Amino acid sequence: VVVAEGAQQLAAEQSARPLSAFFGLDNNLPFGANVLCLGASGEDGMPVVLSHTVNPDSLQAEDFRVVRQSGAANTPMCVTLRPAGDMDENRTVLLIGEFGNADDDPPVKVLIVDDVLSDATDSAQVNFRGTQVSVIPLDAGPEIILAAAVPKDIWSLSGRGTSCPTATKQVVRVTWTGGVRLPNRDELGEAQRTLYKVSLTAADGSRSEVNPAALAELGDADNNHFLCLDTTTPATAVAFPAGHLVDPNGDLNAD
């Protein structure tokens, strides 16, 4: 996955659209999801990753419609930017409700049918209304959907997750299509740090590959990781091998 120079570059390089819609859980959101939305326990969960960060005040459940294989359509019970709620993360919208069953009438498409606005302050605000994306099936594994450099004034803030070491020189945020953990449900550790590969491109065009010096943004149950680097040579791509992490449904990650 190519690393963008930041949220501004991501916004400038693509039109407003959903990048992914991931059928994460089918009638299986845990009891704790009631904190996100009263009555969410036992419902479906579908994180939708957007091309731009969005204005939370423009989000309403009625802005989204989930279409099933049969053609039937549902409006979510609720939508939320949690748990991916730290600074500059507000592009993953969790849809909660009844979106069909994986085995007989699965969801196939998410439509944005009303105004969902970007939170741009230094560029033109964009509207996601009229856009759509195909749904990634329940039994598919999670994958990295985007990666972007994080400004120091953001990564140096303390958020809900763990922080990069103070000696960190550069941070890349990796966003997955859905939340990921180890197969035993533990958080990522040292072994997974060494599985992340970051490509660097120097000013003279020479390239090299490193592992992150540390992983951060852990422990907050969202779909973002910080790759903390101890070099100032710009990061230009990120990779993580298949088969090491699982989504909440227990499906192993793809490449």
Regions found by a protein language model. Give the residues of each.
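Non-catalytic beta-sheet/beta-sandwich ligand-binding modules that flank or precede catalytic cores
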Residues: 2-255
